[in-house]
């Protein structure tokens, strides 16, 4: 599903995944719950092909187009899209973990993820230990014999702490664990964790990828093997995105490389001015000491 390697990132954002039906420049919105069961589609379904167009809970033209674009942006082998970021996270956890398994995650993890790990997964016999996102040694100290996943965020939501991804990957590889990163607050514009050895990248596409506060969505990117497992969960749990949201998301992703430099510049300037304001007690921003750590390798590819 990846776009040609000779395309620059901004070009991939615009062109990867677009389905030019009827010579259209953009992927049209396919408001169809069901597709005709041709012999070719039946053969694909019987062979277990993920992106066979039969029923929109399984796959749709619009969800496939968005998945291909996100896959190209993150440099993955395959991707799946979801109705929300939490649908992506919960489906991933439920398909990769079993009763008796253990996760190490950040104490600063997104609130919805924290609730999943501390309230819902324990009911299924899956335990989580919270560690310091800025201290890989605290993650390593929390690892148990039954640990299966190290879960991190590139930049924590909402406290904006920056994670040393290469160092976390080293910890994961030493213990033969999956390393999963929520890359929502960095976006592929700033960081492409798969290139650093991460196993799966998760997004709430509601945020920077969508970019206009008018959609809800999620995505997971990684190897074909892992995405195949997660796709099966999406089919069974029903967290598939609707075509209109996918169309809006595809539109938003085209302008990611145009939007992010302005967004990051403006937020840094706002943080600087607030820091100088006499009535402001504390400011959290990735350019300020509360967020920054030493990164062992550049996060911008």
Model-assigned labels for residue ranges:
Residues 74, 153, 297:
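Acidic-residue sensor for enzyme active/binding pockets
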Residues 39-87, 112-120:
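Conserved N-terminal alpha-helix of the aminotransferase class I/II PLP-enzyme fold
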Residues 293-301:
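Single conserved hydrophobic/aromatic residue that forms the stacking wall/gate
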Residues 26, 280, 300:
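Active-site lining segments that contact anionic ligands and/or coordinate catalytic metals
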């Amino acid at each position: 599903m990846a776009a040609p390697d000779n395309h620059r990132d901004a070009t991939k954002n615009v062109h990867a995944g677009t389905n030019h039906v009827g010579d259209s420049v953009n992927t049209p919105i396919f408001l169809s719950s069901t597709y005709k069961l041709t012999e070719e589609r039946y053969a694909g379904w019987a062979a277990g092909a993920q992106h066979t167009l039969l029923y929109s809970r399984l796959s749709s033209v619009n969800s496939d187009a968005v998945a291909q674009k996100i896959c190209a942006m993150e440099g993955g082998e395959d991707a799946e899209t979801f109705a929300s970021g939490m649908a992506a996270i919960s489906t991933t956890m439920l398909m990769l973990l079993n009763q008796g398994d253990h996760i190490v995650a950040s104490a600063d993890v997104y609130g919805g993820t924290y609730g999943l790990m501390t309230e819902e997964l324990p009911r299924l016999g899956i335990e989580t230990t919270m560690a310091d996102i800025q201290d890989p040694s605290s993650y390593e100290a929390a690892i148990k014999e039954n640990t299966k996943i190290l879960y991190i965020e590139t930049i924590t939501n909402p406290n904006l702490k920056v994670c040393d991804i290469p160092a976390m990957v080293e910890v994961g590889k030493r213990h033969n664990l999956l390393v999963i990163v929520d890359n929502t607050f960095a976006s592929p514009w700033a960081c492409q964790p798969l290139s650093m050895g991460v196993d799966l990248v998760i997004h709430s596409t509601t945020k920077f990828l969508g970019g206009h506060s008018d959609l809800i969505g999620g995505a997971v990117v990684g190897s074909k093997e892992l995405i195949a497992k997660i796709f099966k969960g999406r089919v069974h749990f029903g967290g598939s995105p609707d075509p209109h949201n996918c169309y809006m998301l595809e539109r938003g992703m085209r302008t990611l490389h145009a939007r992010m430099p302005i967004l990051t510049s403006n937020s840094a300037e706002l943080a600087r001015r607030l820091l100088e304001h006499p009535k402001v007690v504390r400011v959290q921003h990735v350019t300020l000491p509360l967020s920054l750590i030493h990164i062992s390798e550049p996060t911008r590819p």
